[in-house]
Amino acid sequence: MSFMIIEEIKERALNLLSEKEEDFKVIDFSFALPYSYVLIESNGKKALGVAMTLLEEYRGHGNRKDLNINKNLEEFINMADSFDIVERTLGVAAINAVSQYYFNFEANGKDAAELVLNRDDIKKIAFVGNMIPVVNMLKKSEKFDIYVFERSPSLLMDGVLSDAFEYRLLPEMDAVFISGTTLLNDTLDFVLDRAKNAKLKILVGPTAQSLPELFKGFGITHIASTKIIDVDKALLYLKFASSSMLFKGASKKYTMEVE
């Protein structure tokens, strides 16, 4: 039986908890806009994990939702492969929180676009998800043929293709920037399979802020995400739905190879 990537990542995260034997407590969590989050603490050290909230996937729960607010960290992580988008989002955020807790490197501030800007063997680039800042940066270079795919109606605009065309076009790409939200809508496996000819397959965004070792063996070459450096400030920004300030004032971006 083959496992989906998110199922394997979940198991790796649970194994990490077992190995470290840390006494984690879930301090706070929220399914919120634009990012959901899980806040954990152990031995006086706090860590915050986030995941983008895919509002278009949310269908509501009425009165049937199990409102158990006393879940432990393992229970949160076990929700990462749930078919319920609220549970799944919080599960991925919990995995990211554990990853942020164990990150032992300095964020290098490197932008994902730098991976392709100086390469002569990259011509066709796909974006699975409309990552407007990175797309614009690469368009300015006028070196590449750029294809942007998007599922969310709010990000479909001129020049952006429906994600229905990924199946046809991804095999032709030299590099693919993949939104971390593919972990949430279960499309990461499909994207990596269709993009297997690409020299670079880069998982991008705050939702991808997990430890690189959790992604080994899947075909991802790099992760470009954010390390939260001021948990309290980031939490305040999240409560006020301020994504731009979250990235400018409380975290630092990084790009890392998945070895």
From Swiss-Prot:
SUPFAM superfamilies: Dhaf3308-like. It comes from the Archaea. InterPro entries: DUF364, DUF4213. This is Uncharacterized protein MJ0500. It comes from Methanocaldococcus jannaschii (strain ATCC 43067 / DSM 2661 / JAL-1 / JCM 10045 / NBRC 100440) (Methanococcus jannaschii).
